[in-house]
């Protein structure tokens, strides 16, 4: 069995781009995968400010 390919994150999201709660969100400036550690770092920075 071969390892599944991760693929390429393409274009802009048309679903799931509304804030569910809170006042702040992050927006990507380029196409790339984002890790859980990066998301957590942003969350901590927002909580501290």
UniProtKB/Swiss-Prot annotation:
Pfam families: Ribosomal_L16 (PF00252). InterPro entries: Ribosomal_uL16, Ribosomal_uL16_bact-type, Ribosomal_uL16_sf. GO terms for biological process: translation. Keywords: Ribonucleoprotein, Ribosomal protein, RNA-binding, rRNA-binding, tRNA-binding. One of its GO terms (molecular function) is rRNA binding. It comes from the Bacteria. GO terms for cellular component: ribonucleoprotein complex; ribosome. Binds 23S rRNA and is also seen to make contacts with the A and possibly P site tRNAs. Belongs to the universal ribosomal protein uL16 family. Part of the 50S ribosomal subunit. This is Large ribosomal subunit protein uL16. It comes from Aquifex pyrophilus.
């Amino acid at each position: 069995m071969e390892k599944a390919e991760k693929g390429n994150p393409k274009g802009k999201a048309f679903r799931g781009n509304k804030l569910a709660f809170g006042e702040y969100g992050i927006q990507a400036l380029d196409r790339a995968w984002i890790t859980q550690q990066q998301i957590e770092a942003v969350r901590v920075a927002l909580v501290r400010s």
